[in-house]
């Protein structure tokens, strides 16, 4: 009886409750930890049951999950500008706003992706030494993550990227109150990747397919306040 079985059992009870003529709004799902919301949210979306999360964010809206997905996207596609911007200085590696502004302007002027613009600026040697070293370190990190995760299973790829990027270590060493919950969320993301059922018919490699799935999950709107929804 795993977490998915548990969530399916709860969903079956909710649907039976609804079939008996009761309202979804009379149902609340309580979970033991923040990370457990992921499997419930996934099943609710899959079955078209409206829901709303109270007292927190939905799984794929959490900052640490967005950071992790950005790393996975950038490893899969170097020209993903939103992902580049999100994690080029997460965890902090000395890439300041001025360097990022220079990078954006260079990319726009040359019609390049941020990844291409970064290589271009480094080859032109126009950046200050500290900024250049930080930028090169980030580019090298992404290339290393791609090389180290090549040939691994889907779950192992996610685990490798989360460890290799320093995200897991950063949150484990963080002293803020929510650090443990963030680590649990990242570990749950690895579980989500590991358990993802890839459909080769979609024409995508397994990781790209999972990332498309995650984008759909994140894009699903929560139920409106007036809707009859599970909470």
Each model region followed by its residue ranges:
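Helicase P-loop NTPase motor core
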Residues: 1-50, 73-78, 109, 132, ...
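Well-ordered alpha-helical segments embedded in enzymatic catalytic cores
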Residues: 6-13, 67, 188, 231
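A residue-level signal for conserved active-site and pocket-lining positions in enzyme catalytic cores
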Residues: 10, 29, 68, 96, ...
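Accessory C-terminal helicase-associated subdomains
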Residues: 15, 19, 23, 35, ...
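Conserved short internal alpha-helix adjacent to the catalytic or cofactor-binding core
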Residues: 45-49, 57-92
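Helix-hairpin-helix
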Residues: 68, 85-107, 128
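A short beta-strand-loop micro-motif that forms or neighbors metal/cofactor-
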Residues: 107-120
